[in-house]
């Protein structure tokens, strides 16, 4: 009997051990499956990354997401699927997150929304921190390409403390696109052109309180801003002091120290924007960038990325009659804006940071800039090559694997009949016959003489950059040790994408309205609705009186009819 019990116990224990082993293997295999296939959920703006399609939406190659999936598998041996969703506004994105129905690893909001997501306390913070020291299993830094971020942009983020929670993706300015055949260049240097009756019904502004608020605050504090500009240009204040003053003015939402103006800043801006509205063709969300190309309007208040689109389209889509539009950041000042990558709480940090690192490579930055027309915060030799190919006068080498006859050195859009390898070095030398005249060489061969072009410093984007980046810059982009390019023209596409330090000094980040948000929104609704004329008020009251009178008469007649019927019945 004891033997039977012992055998039963041994059999039972074997089954238990087998069950535990199977369970452990199942868990391990499940874990391996999860490790072998990761999902990265990304939420960003529409048309804000190279999706592998042409201008007609036809698939012509891999998207950036597909290439990242391949790169990640080659590097780590793990399959990744990138699920890429898009939103139209920051507010739509925030509402989606609040529902809690969908979670994301990576989101690309605008600067003021990043500020909202960080919040004012740990309890309000919606974001994970980036770990710039995190390394992968190979010992490589996960966010190694952060070194390519322009120190200018990096400093702006670090000053706000945003660098812990966000890495810039694209950035730009707000300004005015204008047609010089209709608009005087001098007039376009100031925001008050939008109030100028000379251009009545020829300009549009954004149907966005945040963007159009910039115009209002710049107009209201015109004198103060121009005085600051004068001090900066006369070296009475530093660039940092100047930018700080502009920042403070741009973010004014009230003015309690001014007893002569009821309501302070908001009251002044409301009056100014109402006057401006009466002079505009109208407010728009996205049509303005096309309307200025077709000639429907002559001035469009725009983001710099949309400005590049408009300038390119007007110039190149109508070869018979090209229109050469310009872009201006008015002298009073403007907004410098950013869209940056953030990781919501609970994100797969390692995978999300790997994707951001991939996007921060100069190669990917150039690729995405080429696709969407906006400006990346990434710098490097590849970016300088792109700038020169798009806007510069120096010859560049182009290699076409599919068409060897198209491979070679190009100047001013034409292939050169010279037998130099890609290692040859272009040079530019001032010509003594006039200002802005230069002679162009490749090695010692003269390519063109007396070329009219402009020398432009880009050193403010590279100053204090990683030494590895500075050492990689080709000699053709350096003058006296400073990063310099030579471009065909000014105040058009090149300056739209890469403003000078003088322009950037008068641009500031617009912060969240905070506790004044409702007051600002009320002000904006008042601007859009406008003041109702007295004659309209009388007309509305008259119609209301007639309607009420008719309603009363109808009810009175019904009551009399009922009374008559009761008498008849009785």
Feature locations, PLM:
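Early extracytoplasmic/lumenal segment of secretory-pathway proteins
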Residues: 34-120, 141
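Mature extracytoplasmic/periplasmic domains
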Residues: 339-498
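Cytoplasmic C-terminal tails of single-pass
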Residues: 558-570
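C-terminal motif of bacterial Sec signal peptides marking the signal peptidase cleavage site
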Residues: 27-31
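Juxtamembrane/start-of-transmembrane alpha-helix segments at the extracytoplasmic/lumenal side
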Residues: 527-544
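Extracytoplasmic ligand-binding site segments that recognize negatively charged/polar headgroups
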Residues: 43-61, 110-296, 310-313
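Extracytoplasmic/periplasmic substrate-binding proteins
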Residues: 278-346, 386, 390-397
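Alpha-helical transmembrane segments
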Residues: 544-558
């Amino acid at each position: 009997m004891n033997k039977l019990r012992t055998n039963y116990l041994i059999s039972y224990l074997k089954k238990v051990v087998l069950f535990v082993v199977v369970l452990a293997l199942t868990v391990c295999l499940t874990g391996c499956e999860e490790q072998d296939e990761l999902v990265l959920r990304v939420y960003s703006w529409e048309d804000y990354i190279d999706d592998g399609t042409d201008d007609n939406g036809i698939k012509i190659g891999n998207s950036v997401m597909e290439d990242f999936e391949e790169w990640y598998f080659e590097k780590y041996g793990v399959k990744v699927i990138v699920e890429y969703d898009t939103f139209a506004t920051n507010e739509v994105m925030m509402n989606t997150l609040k529902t809690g129905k969908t979670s994301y690893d990576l989101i690309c909001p605008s600067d003021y929304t990043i500020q909202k997501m960080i919040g004012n306390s740990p309890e309000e913070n919606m974001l994970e921190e980036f770990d710039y020291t995190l390394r992968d299993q190979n010992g490589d830094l996960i966010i190694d390409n952060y070194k390519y971020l322009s120190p200018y942009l990096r400093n702006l983020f670090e000053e706000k403390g945003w660098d812990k929670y966000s890495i810039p993706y694209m950035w730009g300015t707000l300004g005015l696109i204008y047609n010089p055949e209709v608009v005087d260049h001098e007039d376009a240097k100031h925001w008050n052109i939008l109030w100028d009756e000379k251009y009545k019904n020829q300009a549009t502004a954004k149907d966005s309180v945040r963007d159009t608020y910039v115009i209002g605050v710049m107009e209201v504090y015109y004198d103060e801003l121009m005085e600051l500009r004068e001090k900066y240009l006369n070296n009475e204040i530093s660039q940092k002091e100047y930018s700080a003053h502009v920042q403070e003015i741009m973010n004014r939402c009230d003015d309690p120290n001014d007893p002569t103006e009821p309501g302070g800043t908001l009251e002044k801006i409301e009056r100014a924007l109402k006057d401006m509205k009466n002079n505009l063709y109208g407010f728009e969300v996205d049509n303005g960038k096309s309307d200025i190309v077709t000639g429907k309007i002559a001035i469009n208040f725009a983001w710099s990325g949309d400005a590049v689109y408009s300038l390119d389209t007007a110039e190149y889509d109508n070869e018979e009659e090209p229109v050469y539009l310009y872009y201006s950041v008015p002298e009073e000042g403007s907004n410098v804006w950013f869209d940056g990558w953030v990781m919501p709480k609970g994100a797969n940090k390692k995978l999300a940071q790997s994707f951001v690192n991939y996007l921060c490579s100069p190669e990917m930055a150039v690729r995405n800039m080429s696709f969407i027309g906006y400006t990346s915060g990434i710098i490097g030799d590849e970016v300088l090559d792109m700038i020169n190919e798009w806007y510069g006068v120096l010859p560049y080498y182009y290699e076409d694997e599919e068409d060897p006859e198209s491979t070679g050195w190009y100047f001013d859009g034409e292939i050169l009949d010279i037998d130099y390898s890609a290692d040859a070095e272009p040079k530019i030398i001032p010509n003594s016959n006039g200002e802005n005249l230069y002679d162009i060489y490749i090695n010692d061969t003269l390519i063109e003489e007396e070329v009219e072009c402009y020398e432009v410093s880009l050193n403010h984007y590279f100053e204090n950059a990683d030494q590895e980046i500075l050492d990689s810059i080709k000699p053709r982009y350096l003058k006296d040790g400073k990063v310099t390019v030579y471009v065909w023209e000014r105040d058009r596409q090149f300056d739209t994408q890469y403003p000078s330090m003088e322009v950037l000094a008068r641009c500031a980040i617009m912060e969240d309205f905070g506790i004044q948000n409702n007051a600002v929104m009320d002000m904006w609704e008042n601007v859009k609705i406008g003041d109702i004329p007295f004659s309209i008020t009388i007309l509305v009251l008259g119609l209301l009186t007639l309607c009420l009178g008719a309603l009363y008469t109808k009810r009175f007649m019904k009551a009399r009819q009922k009374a008559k019927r009761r008498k008849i019945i009785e």
